[in-house]
Regions:
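Low-complexity, intrinsically disordered tandem-repeat tracts enriched in small/polar residues
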Residues: 7, 18-20, 39-41, 49, ...
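Canonical leucine-rich repeat
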Residues: 1, 22-24, 43-45, 64-66, ...
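Residues on the solvent-exposed faces and adjacent turns
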Residues: 5, 26, 47, 68, ...
Length: 171
């Protein structure tokens, strides 16, 4: 898929194909990218600083750099092979769906607008959500989390934390 000459593109829907590469360096105006369920092993979105919605789920990604994408409000990167995810620069995020990866840590302290977080089916041993006071939905099931403090999360309407190693749950 060659979109290098389509510099005015704001939306790309290329999901459920067999794409192994996607060159987006000339698509600086891109706001919405839906490239889920392909065969992508890498995704460079460093030049796509206008991105607000990204769904790259169901690929073969081992890493994802969203540090330049400070306007992101929704991030769907589940069902990949991602081992680390730094979302500390993405302070506009309201939804992060990074389940079914290989994450060993996830820092969400800077993401104070976060309302939905699904980080289940990873390898997390801890999750600090004290700063995420707007959180409505949290699914951190099937990790190795030892303790979980949801005392500051008074807006929670859904909490799923089964199949962890919890010895302490502060509600």
């Amino acid at each position: 898929l060659d979109v290098s000459k389509n510099t005015e593109l704001e939306w790309i829907y290329c999901y459920k194909n067999a794409l192994t590469a996607l060159d987006l360096r000339y698509n600086a105006r891109l706001k919405w990218l839906f490239c889920y369920e392909n065969a992508l092993t890498s995704l460079d979105i460093g030049n796509n600083r206008e991105l607000t919605e990204l769904d790259c789920s169901g690929n073969l990604l081992t890493s994802l750099d969203v540090s330049c994408n400070t306007k992101l409000t929704s991030l769907f990167c589940y069902d990949n092979r991602i081992t680390s995810l730094d979302i500390s620069n993405n302070m506009e995020l309201t939804g992060v769906f990074c389940y079914k990866n290989s994450l060993t840590s996830l820092a969400v302290g800077n993401n104070t607008q976060l309302k939905n977080l699904n980080c289940s089916h990873n390898r997390l041993t801890s999750l600090d959500i004290k700063q995420n006071t707007l959180l409505n939905n949290l699914n951190c099931s099937e990790n190795s989390i030892l303790s979980l403090d949801v005392g500051n999360n008074t807006e929670l309407t859904f909490l799923s934390c089964y199949k962890n190693r919890l010895t302490m749950l502060d509600i």
